[in-house]
A protein has these predicted regions:
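Acidic catalytic motifs of isoprenoid enzymes
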Residues: 1-192
């Protein structure tokens, strides 16, 4: 049986190992909030690893693994607990802070897009993807951060998520090309630059 403490520790390890910039930023938060931010990172990392790090596994198998992960998360959430080392902390965080589960659905939809969509024609097309891959992360964070006005905080939280994602796209251009993906919009950016 996985303990809640071990689950939060695993999420923290994932955040520290793979999201060093995001991990460092958690030190700006009150100590009691940090484990919950690590849990959200753990969820996102788990899904991202299914999409990107299964090596030469066929797309259909990765899609099935991602769907299974989503179904397991939904079932664990309904049960109020999980035996999974990462999901146990995620379920606890979602329930403790009443995070909108629809945010996780949108995130998983965007991760599924990564399996089949290799390029984005326009910035508007890319924004549809980033709504679930980035903006939604800001929405997930808000209940943990407890702003005084949730409605007022939502747009900048979404915008910050998108800004982080765009920065990652620029930083990871080579890595994304190796995976057969181009996140820079063809028409809006590359076409104008004649790249």
């Amino acid at each position: 049986m996985t303990t809640l403490e071990a689950s939060y520790a695993r999420c923290r390890e994932l955040n520290k190992a793979y999201g060093t910039t995001y991990y460092a930023s958690t030190f700006l938060l009150p100590r009691a909030r940090r484990p919950h931010v690590h849990a959200l990172y753990g969820f996102c990392r788990y899904a991202d690893d299914i999409v990107d790090d299964l090596g030469p596994v066929p797309v259909a198998e990765r899609a099935a693994a991602l769907a299974d992960f989503g179904a397991r998360f939904t079932a664990d959430l309904a049960a109020g607990d999980s035996d999974d080392l990462v999901l146990k902390a995620v379920v606890d965080t979602v329930l403790r802070f009443d995070i909108d589960v629809e945010c996780f659905d949108r995130f998983l939809r965007s991760m599924t897009m990564d399996l089949t969509v290799a390029t984005y024609e326009t910035f508007d097309d890319l924004m549809l993807y980033m709504d679930g891959s980035a903006a939604v992360i800001g929405e997930m964070m808000l209940p943990i951060l407890e702003p005084s006005d949730l409605g007022l905080a939502r747009p900048p939280a979404r915008d910050l998520g998108v800004a982080f994602q765009l920065t990652n796209f620029l930083r990871d251009v080579g890595e994304d090309l190796d995976r057969g993906r181009v996140y820079l919009p063809q028409e809006d950016q590359i076409g104008r630059a004649h790249v």
